A protein has these predicted regions:
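Elongated, amphipathic alpha-helical interaction scaffolds
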Residues: 1-185
Length: 185
């Protein structure tokens, strides 16, 4: 096996181990899931211990093709809401290499895989999905950054703007890791 492939596999395994560590997760999960942002790391660790935040299968399977995610958590928010969090570690290979369509495909696959699960009732029971992409070696202008992509409804009618219901079931979060000394205060 080529050295580059072996190195990539080792980096990938290290990233997965780090994101499965409760001490690390309890400090970063609020970045990925804003609803958990006001909860202390100690409370997050307690949620993890109590089974409110649990790792689940990373195999995303469909009839046509399967995908393997790095780390996926099932989350039960203190308010009773439930969500799924996919965390992916990503290295840039060349400028513009991060494929937003890939991030969207992972998020949509997590939505789709809920159908047929033991918790499935109907489309109203879909959990919100967060797909967090941690850029491990971002370009200099993207370091220490968090960018969110959400679905937003807009009306194209001129005369009448109907009430547009909130469609809050999918969010892609891109985090650019950087040197803390470079972060703005």
């Amino acid at each position: 096996m080529r050295k580059e492939i072996v190195d990539d596999m080792r980096r990938d395994q290290r990233f997965k181990s780090i994101m499965l560590d409760t001490r690390v997760l309890s400090r970063v999960i609020g970045i990925f899931v804003p609803e958990l942002g006001g909860i202390s790391p100690e409370e997050i660790a307690e949620m993890r211990k109590n089974g409110d935040i649990v790792p689940v299968s990373t195999e995303l399977v469909s009839a046509k093709r399967s995908m393997s995610a790095d780390v996926v958590y099932s989350i039960s928010h203190p308010g009773g809401e439930k969500a799924l969090l996919d965390i992916e570690g990503q290295l840039y290979r060349k400028p513009g290499d991060i494929d937003y369509n890939r991030a969207l495909a992972y998020a949509v696959k997590l939505l789709e895989d809920q159908r047929g699960s033991p918790e499935w009732v109907d489309y109203g029971s879909l959990r919100k999905v967060y797909s967090a992409w941690v850029m491990l070696d971002p370009h200099a202008d993207e370091r220490n950054s968090v960018v969110r992509y959400r679905l937003k409804g807009e009306s194209d009618t001129v005369d009448h703007v109907p009430e547009i219901p909130e469609l809050d079931k999918l969010e892609i979060v891109r985090v650019g890791i950087g040197n803390p000394s470079e972060a703005e205060s």
